[in-house]
């Protein structure tokens, strides 16, 4: 399939249609007969397969050139007699064509034309020429970026190659590096070079003298014993704690000055002391260390950040020690203070993170002119409070750190927006972590945004996402799929490349997934809690009685309902928030409809409340009702157990292992999952795992080797895959062991917090240097974002009704 000029694509599609006019007329007529609307990629293919079944003469279409077009179509807009196709030949690349079904003619469409055509689904033929169009591409036109889809998510490697090539031009190209080393300070003290070194020749001479001097010292000589001599040559304390460490840094810089190399440059920048104070933003939900998991809007993100902070502090302490500095690092997790804390610590202003020495949770309330909001509110309703929250956070952070942070990390849409406001105000490096971009989780939530506005306020959220992702210095994701999806699925960030919200604005270029700001940095599970079921000496057998109570007790109450009559059967296990996207009710229905699967295994679900009246989350309440309905509709008594959300992480870890003892499996059935922390947890416990193919789990799991991919949009196939697995295990028990061990091997190779923290701090150093060297202050982009924030986001946020403690 051509991927060059748009006109070439138009001609290619036209030629493909011309070759089989009658067959394709039949297919397109079926699309048009469904009336105006949007057909997603799987619907296009499903309709094609139905057409082939009805008319066997269309079988040849399977091998036709047009089939490649159809397989790469992201969506189709049907407005009879037209069908417009968004064709995605590879991740990050889109082209648009429109077919007149009556004439079988083909037109090429620009992004703007395609989106205007799409808007007619909502607006009819209303004139959309004067709708605000957002286009960030001109601001980035001169910046380097890769072009291969395989390079997406490897931004720092590309930057290192680019920086090295610039430095190799001539000695003058090294001046920005010298300036960076001379101006780099902490608390007013120079970290690398002092005023004795004014230019590159002086630096090279000083490095040569230092190299000779250090070569005569024992490798383990403490820095304090030769500090005065090095300072006299122009070097300050940040080069290392021993003669060996300082010598390694000197050699790295000499190599860079002689012949810049990308890997050497990254190693050198990663060892420069840059990050001492970190601020992490996560405003929504109940952010605490105990009794919070399972509360509304409180789940994997809290676990992720707490594990991240512990690993990050360990790495910061290790690096500071190796750098020969006497600096105490500080990490602040900034979240919302909740006076109505529901028995948690969320009403405490400052709380030390357990397992750390210098990391704290700093809580700041949401407030308005009427005072402090005391109760929890949904993450979808926080937008009117964030600007004031950011101002208050700025003051509180300055007081706690007695200065400004070196790095600000945002989490989710609200945290990333606050991070953007703070980073712009303080002039600090900003890192974004999306966790989940709601636009991907709720299909067609952009074009039909008005239908969701009262409940979800997506207009504010999508606007905040665009501002934050364009303001960030670098973005880390857990998987490639989060950025650019896969061959058949669009990535979370990729979905923000071009979209429209009719009547509000049209995004013709929102984000470029080829931007070198994107980096894949995968987290792990806390291996003090999650470890293999076979590690008998570490097993928490004291918890087995309470676990068996959860699983098998005959008592029906607010913590568990349902019975498992045959306790000898293996258990299909799933644990998640109880919302539509996590699709726990979909798994229950999938299980309930397959008699063979019910015969082979029991089903245990952990999530949400049992009693609808205990929930305050709108979506969760609907799922609770659906779960109870499914139990009765399919008479699941005796084969199904529903357990309310569990907040004890240690017991949850042992629960995974207990399920493994039954030779059971873990299933993650979400319609979309950005990463899949529970997938990593279950695999770390060596529990065979089946997880959605939509999102990150498809990347974590090697299908058939370290687990299995499932498609929740085809529940019959999910059930068949599970049946096949259990039947194979019944005849060959080693099959269960093989998948169990394959999952564990995958975790050890790719998903640990140690590797994560090392990478994150290295990225912070490289992007700080890149921002300095390129003079990338992005004034034009910032002004554009400020205008967009002031003229669009602020009005959208302020249109959301403020919550009251009475209602």
Swiss-Prot record:
The protein's Enzyme Commission number: 2.4.1.13
GO CC annotations on file: cytosol; plant-type cell wall; plastid membrane
Tissue specificity statement from the Swiss-Prot or TrEMBL entry: Detected in the whole plant but at lower levels. Predominantly expressed in developing siliques. Also detected in the root tip. Detected in the embryo, endosperm and seed coat (at the protein level).
InterPro entries on file: Glyco_trans_1, Sucrose_synth_GT-B1, Sucrose_synthase_pln/cyn, SUS_EPBD, SUS_N
Induction (UniProt): By anaerobic stress and by glucose. Positively regulated by the NF-Y/HAP transcription factor complex at least composed of NFYB9/LEC1 or NFYB6/L1L and NFYC2/HAP5B in association with DPBF2/BZIP67. Positively regulated by LEC2.
Keywords: Cytoplasm, Glycosyltransferase, Membrane, Plastid, Stress response, Transferase
Localization of this protein: Cytoplasm; Plastid membrane
Knockout or disruption consequences: No visible phenotype. Diminution of the starch content of developing seeds and increased lipid accumulation early during seed development.
Superkingdom: Eukaryota
Region described as GT-B glycosyltransferase: spans on this chain: 274-752
Protein's GO biological process: response to hypoxia; seed maturation; starch metabolic process; sucrose metabolic process
GO molecular function, one term: sucrose synthase activity
One protein family per Pfam: GT-B_Sucrose_synth
Membrane topology: Peripheral membrane protein
Keyword presence, Acyltransferase: no
Keyword Cytoplasm (UniProt): yes
Catalytic activity: an NDP-alpha-D-glucose + D-fructose = a ribonucleoside 5'-diphosphate + sucrose + H(+)
PANTHER family: PTHR45839, SUCROSE SYNTHASE 2
Family: Belongs to the glycosyltransferase 1 family. Plant sucrose synthase subfamily.
Function: Sucrose-cleaving enzyme that provides UDP-glucose and fructose for various metabolic pathways. Modulates metabolic homeostasis and directs carbon towards starch synthesis in developing seeds.
Stated name of the protein: Sucrose synthase 2
Provenance organism: Arabidopsis thaliana
Source organism phylogeny: Eukaryota, Viridiplantae, Streptophyta, Embryophyta, Tracheophyta
């Amino acid at each position: 399939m051509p991927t060059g000029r748009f006109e070439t694509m138009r001609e290619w599609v036209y030629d493909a249609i011309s070759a089989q006019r009658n067959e394709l007329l039949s297919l397109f007529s079926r699309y048009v007969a469904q009336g105006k609307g949007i057909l997603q990629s799987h619907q296009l293919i499903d309709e094609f397969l139905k057409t082939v079944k009805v008319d066997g003469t269309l079988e040849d279409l399977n091998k036709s050139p047009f089939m490649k077009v159809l397989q790469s179509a992201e969506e189709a807009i049907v407005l009879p007699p037209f069908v417009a196709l968004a064709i995605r030949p590879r991740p990050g690349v889109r082209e648009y064509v429109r077919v007149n079904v009556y004439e079988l003619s083909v037109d090429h469409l620009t992004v703007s034309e395609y989106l205007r055509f799409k808007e007619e689904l909502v607006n009819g033929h209303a004139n959309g020429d004067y709708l605000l169009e957002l286009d960030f591409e001109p601001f980035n036109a001169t910046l380097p970026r890769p072009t291969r889809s395989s390079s997406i998510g490897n931004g720092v490697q590309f930057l290192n190659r680019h920086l090295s090539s610039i430095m190799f031009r001539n000695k003058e190209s090294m001046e920005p590096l010298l300036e960076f080393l001379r101006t780099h300070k902490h608390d007013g003290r120079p970290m690398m070079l002092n005023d004795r070194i004014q230019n590159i020749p002086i630096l090279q001479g000083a490095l040569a003298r230092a190299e000779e001097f250090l070569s005569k010292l024992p490798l383990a000589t403490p820095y304090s014993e030769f500090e005065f001599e090095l300072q006299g040559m122009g070097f300050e304390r940040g080069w290392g704690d021993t003669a060996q460490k300082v010598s390694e840094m000197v050699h790295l810089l000499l190599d860079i000055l002689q012949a810049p190399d990308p890997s050497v440059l990254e190693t050198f920048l990663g060892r420069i002391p840059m990050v001492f104070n970190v601020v992490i933003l996560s405003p929504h939900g109940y952010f605490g260390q105990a009794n919070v998991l399972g509360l509304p809007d409180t789940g994997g993100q809290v676990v992720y950040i707490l594990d991240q902070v512990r690993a990050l502090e360990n790495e910061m302490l290790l690096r500071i020690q190796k750098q020969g500095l006497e600096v105490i690092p500080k990490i602040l997790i900034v979240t919302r203070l909740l006076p109505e804390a529901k028995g948690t610590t969320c009403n405490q202003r400052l709380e030390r993170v357990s397992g750390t020495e210098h990391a704290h949770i700093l809580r700041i309330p949401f407030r308005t002119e009427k005072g402090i909001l005391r109760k929890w509110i949904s993450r979808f309703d926080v937008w009117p409070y964030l600007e004031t929250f950011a101002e208050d956070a700025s003051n509180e952070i300055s007081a706690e750190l007695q200065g400004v942070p070196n790095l600000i990390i945002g989490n989710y849409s609200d945290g990333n927006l606050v991070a953007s406001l703070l980073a712009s105000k303080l002039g600090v490096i900003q890192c974004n972590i999306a966790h989940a971009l709601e636009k991907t989780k709720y299909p067609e939530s952009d074009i039909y945004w008005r239908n969701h506005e009262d409940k979800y306020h997506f207009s504010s959220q999508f606007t905040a996402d665009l501002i934050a992702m364009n303001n960030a210095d670098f973005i880390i994701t857990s998987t490639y799929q989060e950025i650019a999806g896969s061959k058949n699925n669009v990535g979370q960030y990729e979905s923000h490349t071009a979209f429209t919200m009719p009547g509000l604005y049209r995004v013709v270029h929102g984000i470029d997934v080829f931007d070198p700001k994107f980096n894949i940095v995968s987290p792990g599970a806390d291996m003090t809690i999650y470890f293999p079921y076979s590690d008998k000496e570490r097993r928490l057998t004291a918890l087995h009685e309470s676990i068996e109570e959860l699983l098998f007790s005959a008592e029906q109450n607010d913590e568990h309902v349902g019975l498992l009559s045959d306790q000898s059967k293996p258990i299909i296990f799933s644990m998640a928030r109880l919302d539509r996207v996590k699709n726990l009710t979909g798994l229950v229905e999938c299980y309930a409809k397959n008699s063979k699967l019910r015969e082979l295994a029991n089903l245990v679900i952990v999530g949400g409340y049992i009693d609808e009246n205990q929930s305050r989350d709108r979506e969760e309440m609907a799922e609770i009702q659906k779960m109870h309905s499914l139990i009765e509709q399919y008479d699941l008594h005796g084969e199904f157990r529903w357990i309310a959300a569990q907040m004890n992480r240690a017991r949850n870890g042992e629960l995974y292992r207990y399920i493994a003892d039954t030779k059971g499996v873990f299933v993650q059935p979400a319609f979309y999952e950005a990463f899949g922390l529970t997938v990593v947890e279950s695999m770390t416990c060596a529990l065979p795992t089946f997880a959605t193919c939509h999102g990150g789990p498809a990347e974590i799991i090697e299908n058939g080797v370290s687990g299995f991919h499932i498609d929740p949009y085809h529940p019959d196939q999910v059930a068949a895959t599970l049946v096949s697995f259990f039947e194979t295990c019944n005849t060959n028990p080693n099959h269960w062991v093989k998948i169990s061990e394959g999952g564990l091997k995958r975790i050890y190779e790719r998903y640990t917090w140690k590797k994560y923290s090392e990478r994150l701090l290295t990225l912070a150093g490289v992007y700080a240097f890149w921002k300095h060297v390129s003079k990338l202050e992005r004034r034009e982009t910032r002004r554009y974002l400020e205008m967009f924030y002031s003229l669009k986001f602020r009005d959208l946020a302020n249109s959301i009704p403020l919550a009251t403690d009475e209602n």
